[in-house]
Amino acid sequence: MKNAFSLLNPRIRELIRKEGYLHPTPPQEKAIPVILKGGNVLLIAPTGWGKTEAVFFPLFHLLLDDPRGEGIKAIYVTPLRALNRDLFRRMQSLASSLGIRMAMRHGDTSGYERRKQLLFPPDILITTPETLQAILPAPKMREHLRRVRFVVVDEIHEIASSKRGTQLSLALERLVNLTGREFQRVGLSATVGSHEVIANFLGGVGRNVTI
């Protein structure tokens, strides 16, 4: 019987099978097809139900199909540097096996790593709201950010309910202006008070979000 994993690139299916991902969880079964079709998604599910994989697996698929060259194609925003590091640790091996470059960028990032990102921009940049706001005006980073096609916001309830939410909303609109087109948006949360409010925060004005 086919499931959401059957929609993924065969290389991804083989890799995740070796990692022990044999069957999608219910959130993955629902989210993966929508993400693959280009829809904006707010994914709400308890911790331990594979929300991260529900985003990264289809993201890897879409990046493998991306014909464009160098540049940052996906931005993954989290509220915490520790979460950045955890995500990188969990997904870097899979990404590397697929030839997809990942990198982190936040206040602790070394000067060497920042220069490396300018010379060899990652396909996926994991960052924080503050750092995204900080790199948007930088001329060389702007060139790399013009290729962004996807933005993921993890722990979106924490960001939306604070001053950082306004900061991130402004950064995303600036990113739309920079890219000259809409990009796909995905929000992740284990708990959300009002689904509609968070979906509106994620999508902004006039953009549909599937919950």
Language-model region placement:
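Interdomain "pre-motor" coupling segment immediately N-terminal to P-loop NTPase/helicase cores
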Residues: 1-3
